[in-house]
């Protein structure tokens, strides 16, 4: 095991503070409407230019192991805020830096670190409760657009496109962000249920100009096993042919003789048919087949429930207004399922979302929810260069998370004002002893840091602005984009309450841990110079004696 170096007390905390400040100073340059850019070098390709706090934080590793520990802990603040609300990373970093700097000064002056932490925690709880009271619901499109704009570093086009997407697919709908091919941002909305499986054979195509298979008013046969024997399918095919309607088969797979027979029937015009693999894998495939069954009013043909393919009748088939298949996707439009059944299924999936602890499962469940409840919107980000595209895509994703958070917990005045207003919650707050009171006072000063930094980045005088904002009340604040004072909500400067709350909680949590650090352990630096390789005799250097 490699030797370790251990630092204690003040010398450990000083090293940690250097790392905290290096990382926070790089990140906080991006805060606010007049925040600066940070250029990140890549091991290959062009450097990335960004105004996204968490992207900057992720890139920073320091050479000194003890300083690096401080930097990594602040990086953790940014990640925690990002995981909780998808945004607010820069605010969280600025708050953490202020808490750690103020806290370590107090520790150096002889205060008890544990009492300081208790004071900070007490004040944080009071401010979080106050933020929840300050929050106003974010219901209309205009407010959603404003939140998106602020989160995307004051880019109106991003705010507007997110509001439009939410308008079209509803608050529950899935909105995905992709890299576009043009210069402008584009929004495309998929009505109905879409899943990522295309037709099993190009011979099913009936619209050669667009390379799609389109079925009008089809019946849907849903099977949770492979179909390779055509005999199993014959009873259903004959019934469908008599009914004179097209058929879509969704099965684990259709292969061999069965697929060949379907293709021949389709080409001869006996039965208009298309086949597609069921989406997902394993248990998720079964659940998604069940979703399609409920959406279209059909039944999944499964041996688990005692149904075999030979015994399937028209009653077991689902109905839809239209189905469109291309080589990658299948879209079912206007399924004929009973609304009450669909709502019950949606409620069931919502419950699963609340209960699951896995982020991946949660994301997949939410996709299923959207496919049943609303639709899917795709925002294609446009830009002139690859570098700009990456930077813009990161901002669109941030803005999307922020708007979701705003819809969830409401909005508060932006620009650091909500935190300053929430200070009234700790006006008369007292700790159990004097050191806890110092912790409360410390947080009171730290909470002003985001507003101070926004003003500093805009080239203003932070103390003057903070003083003027404190004298005001309600939504009164400073608009750094235009250098004016006024009602932040009316000026459209809003932050999601969840983002502000998560930023403060993450910063107070990690800040408190750093203040109470007494020892740090890291790998000892290797002092020995690397051994020189054997120089192999250095022949021919004889007559150089006179050079000394």
Swiss-Prot record:
Q: Does the keyword Chaperone apply?
A: yes
Keyword tags? ATP-binding, Chaperone, Cytoplasm, Isomerase, Nucleotide-binding
> Which Pfam families does this one have?
Cpn60_TCP1
In its UniProt record, a GO molecular function of this protein is:
unfolded protein binding
Name the domain of life this protein comes from: Bacteria
Biological process, per Gene Ontology: protein refolding
- Describe the reaction catalysed, as an equation: ATP + H2O + a folded polypeptide = ADP + phosphate + an unfolded polypeptide
Where does it live in the cell?
Cytoplasm
Q: What class of enzyme is it?
A: isomerase
Binding-site residues for ATP, renumbered to this chain: 30-33, 51, 87-91, 415, 479-481, 495
The coiled-coil regions, if any, are none
EC number(s) reported in the record: 5.6.1.7
Signal peptide span = none
* InterPro entries, alphabetized: Chaperonin_Cpn60_CS, Cpn60/GroEL, Cpn60/GroEL/TCP-1, GroEL-like_apical_dom_sf, GROEL-like_equatorial_sf, TCP-1-like_intermed_sf
**GO CC entries:** cytoplasm
Task performed by this protein: Together with its co-chaperonin GroES, plays an essential role in assisting protein folding. The GroEL-GroES system forms a nano-cage that allows encapsulation of the non-native substrate proteins and provides a physical environment optimized to promote and accelerate protein folding.
Q: How does it assemble?
A: Forms a cylinder of 14 subunits composed of two heptameric rings stacked back-to-back. Interacts with the co-chaperonin GroES.
Q: Which HAMAP family match?
A: CH60
Protein family membership:
Belongs to the chaperonin (HSP60) family.
Please report the name of this protein according to its UniProt entry: Chaperonin GroEL
